[in-house]
């Protein structure tokens, strides 16, 4: 009996040690993802602010575009920026299994910077104070939703399928409203966008957590970290933009 007790205790300690190693590895993996995401968000914000200040002059309380502003906010540059950012995110997503982690991270940062160029135009529409306020509201909401996705024992995959269908419908509605310019439809789109990306934040966090494998080598884990960071970055940026349509103060 004493031999059984000793063997059982040794086995229990071994399982506990393995779980501790997995928990430590998972924690490091998730922290790396959040750090990469934060780097991307910070870079987007800095580039957007610098671009706006280079693109706009203020005279008598009124904003006017500089020659640089006219170039990036109108004409072919807008299309080039849109297609360039779309191409980058598709490249990272489709080629992630072939890219080295450092290369994937570099492409992610290039994408974040390019998106900062595009998003700098929000400063033309909304006041800086309201943008800052909505950013912190979005950050707090994102943090709470991501924490829920990380800690919940509930399987969110059925919700994820529903959210992806909702996202497709949202994109179609946004394209339609470009031509209709309907205020009520715009309000519905904004509300749906907030709800969809709130749900996606929790779902993606759970999915990223479940992708962790302590037996994989560092290269594969590094690729997953970059892809996870890009996914959460896009969730946050879209959540912020849809919230800005609700709570932002227009100039």
Please name every model-derived segment.
Residues 1-251:
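A hydrophobic alpha-helical transmembrane-helix feature that marks the membrane cores
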């Amino acid at each position: 009996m004493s031999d059984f007790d000793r063997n059982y205790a040794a086995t229990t300690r071994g399982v506990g040690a393995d779980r501790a190693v997995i928990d430590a590895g998972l924690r490091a993996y998730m922290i790396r993802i959040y750090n990469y995401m934060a780097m991307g968000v910070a870079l987007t914000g800095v580039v957007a602010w610098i671009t706006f200040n280079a693109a706009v002059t203020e005279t008598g309380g009124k904003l006017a575009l500089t020659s640089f502003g006219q170039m990036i906010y109108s004409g072919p540059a807008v299309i080039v920026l849109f297609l360039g950012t779309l191409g980058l995110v598709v490249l990272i997503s489709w080629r992630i299994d072939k890219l080295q982690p450092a290369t994937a991270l570099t492409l992610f940062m290039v994408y974040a910077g390019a998106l900062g160029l595009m998003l700098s135009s929000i400063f033309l529409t909304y006041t800086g104070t309201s943008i800052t306020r909505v950013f912190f509201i979005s950050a707090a909401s994102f943090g709470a939703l991501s924490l829920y996705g990380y800690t919940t024992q509930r399987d969110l995959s059925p919700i994820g399928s529903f959210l992806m269908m909702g996202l497709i419908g949202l994109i179609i509605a946004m394209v339609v409203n470009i031509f209709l310019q309907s205020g009520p439809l715009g309000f519905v789109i904004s509300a749906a966008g907030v709800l969809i990306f709130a749900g996606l934040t929790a779902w993606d966090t759970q999915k990223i957590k479940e992708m962790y494998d302590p037996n994989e080598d560092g290269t594969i884990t590094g690729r997953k970290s970059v892809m996870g960071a890009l996914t959460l970055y896009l969730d946050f940026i879209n959540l912020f933009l849809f919230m800005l349509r609700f709570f932002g103060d227009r100039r």
